[in-house]
């Protein structure tokens, strides 16, 4: 998607449709006047409430005028960035449905909107650009088109150009913000592509290749450990999960170093289980196809590092991705096995479907021992219990640092990728005690997301600034959340906003 930012008014530019952002206040006073000035019928406003994300189409009466179509997008009271995000996302989604090639956004009110929002014009522009990218997303790379009898090659498959029109004196700020938003949006969509790929199209080695490609785009160093190196490092958690697989595991390190001295060094760890059958503790057949999404944490980390690099943020960001699939076979790990992780801590495997924490344990150990970063954050589709607790729209947050937890919460609010903190009290550690090993990998039916976090806490080696984000719900929601089925790329915006907060 190409970006154009112009001072020209939206009513006079070349575009297939012009998006007009309308608030509930504007609906009463200004919307009719605006439509008349553009030569469109006010009748389109009849049933329009201007709620956030609501759309209605109007048409200009004079033929030959460009843009002919006016897409009114509701922004509610216009006092929250999230309302603008919903509006731009909905408009882009509609544009793709209508096969609109050039979509323009009327930004003539940007200065006033920013004032109402108590933000800068570039921040608003970043939200609009990122949301348009998000709404325009379609995952169709695996469709051959051979059965599509109505296919029209003359019409655009998606939005080819996004135009910010009527920018006036805000042109420079809007251009800077829109460019940043396009970067974050493209990275989030790249994460969605990875998560949407089925297991037969994405192995651990393929995921490592995706990290290499991100490194080329972002200009950062990528190192991939093969099974031999993983074995030398004694990453017993990753190797145990991989025992049932015919595909080798990988351990990928992405290292973005800013120019000059970094303000902080941030380690991001992402769970990369490319398909999770549950192993010997086999999952139910219903819904198992969605377990291609069990590497959503890894996809998020890969693309957050890329976004940080392309935005040239002044923090060092190191991503770690342990990756394998989790399959049943004659060689797979079995319930009751005791394994030794890289840290030397032994784990009783009560359930082979609690595998994500095993590979994360080794990754956290490696990150702490080899880099000792200022902050460690892991993201994982870790527990169904987190969905039971919080539903699909919100991620679970666990941290041993209240200041870090607060920063993540605020970034969640700002980015629209919300997190909610759950406790890490010592009482929960009692639930993962083992009679035969140092720790058990499950804690029973109750408090499953908390006991998983307590398990991970044992592998941070006393690090004082660690957070765990359980994205099981919002990464691939089956209810609520994204209006587009499949992967959401949840966590990319959250992490980018967090990294920017240290800038």
Swiss-Prot record:
Obligatory cofactor(s): Mn(2+)
Subcellular location: Cytoplasm
Top-level taxon: Bacteria
Chain positions recorded as Mn(2+) 1 binding sites: 276, 353, 355
Enzyme class: hydrolase
Gene Ontology terms: biological process: proteolysis
UniProt KW keywords: Aminopeptidase, Cytoplasm, Hydrolase, Manganese, Metal-binding, Protease
UniProt family annotation: Belongs to the peptidase M17 family.
Protein name: Probable cytosol aminopeptidase
Native organism: Chlorobaculum parvum (strain DSM 263 / NCIMB 8327)
């Amino acid at each position: 998607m190409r970006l154009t930012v112009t001072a020209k008014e939206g009513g006079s530019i070349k575009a297939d449709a012009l998006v007009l952002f309308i608030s509930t206040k504007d609906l009463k006073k200004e919307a009719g006047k605006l439509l008349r000035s553009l030569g469109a019928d006010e009748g389109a406003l009849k049933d329009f409430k201007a709620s956030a994300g609501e759309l209605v189409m109007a048409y200009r009466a004079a033929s030959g005028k460009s843009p002919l179509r006016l897409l009114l997008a509701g922004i509610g009271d216009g006092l929250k960035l999230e309302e603008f995000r919903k509006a731009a996302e909905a408009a882009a989604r509609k544009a793709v449905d209508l096969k609109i090639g050039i979509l323009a956004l009327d930004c003539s009110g940007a200065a006033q909107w920013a004032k109402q929002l108590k933000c800068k014009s570039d921040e608003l522009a970043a939200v609009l650009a990122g949301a348009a990218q998000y709404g325009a997303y379609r995952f169709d790379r695996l469709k051959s088109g051979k059965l599509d009898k109505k296919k029209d090659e003359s019409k655009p498959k998606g939005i080819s150009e996004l135009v910010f029109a009527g920018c006036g004196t805000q042109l420079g700020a809007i251009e800077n913000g829109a460019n940043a938003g396009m970067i974050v949006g493209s990275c989030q969509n790249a994460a969605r592509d990875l998560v949407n790929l089925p297991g037969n199209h994405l192995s651990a080695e393929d995921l490592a290749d995706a990290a290499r490609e991100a490194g080329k785009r972002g200009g950062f160093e990528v190192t991939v450990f093969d099974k031999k190196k993983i074995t030398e490092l004694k990453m017993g958690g990753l190797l145990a999960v991989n025992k049932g697989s015919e595909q080798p595991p990988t351990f990928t390190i992405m290292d973005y170093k800013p120019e000059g001295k970094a303000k902080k060094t941030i380690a991001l760890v992402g769970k990369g289980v490319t398909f999770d059958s549950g192993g010997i503790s086999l999952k139910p057949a219903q819904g198992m196809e969605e377990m291609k999404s069990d590497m959503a944490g890894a996809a998020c980390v890969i693309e957050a590092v890329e976004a940080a690099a392309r935005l040239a943020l002044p923090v060092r960001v190191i991503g770690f991705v342990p990756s394998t699939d989790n399959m049943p076979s004659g060689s797979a790990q079995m319930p009751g096995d005791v394994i030794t992780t890289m840290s030397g801590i032994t784990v009783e495997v009560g359930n082979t479907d609690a595998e994500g924490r095993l590979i994360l344990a080794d990754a956290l150990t490696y990150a702490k021992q080899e880099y000792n970063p200022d902050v460690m954050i892991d993201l994982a589709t870790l527990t169904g219990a987190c969905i039971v607790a919080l539903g699909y729209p919100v991620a679970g947050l666990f941290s041993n640092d209240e200041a870090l937890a607060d920063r993540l919460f605020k970034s969640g609010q700002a980015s629209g990728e919300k997190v909610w903190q759950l406790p890490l009290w010592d009482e929960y550690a009692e639930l993962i005690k083992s009679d035969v090993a140092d720790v058990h990998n499950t804690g029973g039916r109750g408090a499953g997301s908390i006991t998983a976090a307590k398990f991970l806490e044992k592998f941070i080696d006393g690090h004082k600034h660690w957070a765990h984000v359980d994205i099981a719900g919002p990464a691939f929601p089956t209810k609520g959340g994204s209006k587009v089925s499949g992967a959401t790329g949840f966590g990319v915006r959250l992490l980018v906003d967090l990294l920017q907060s240290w800038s």
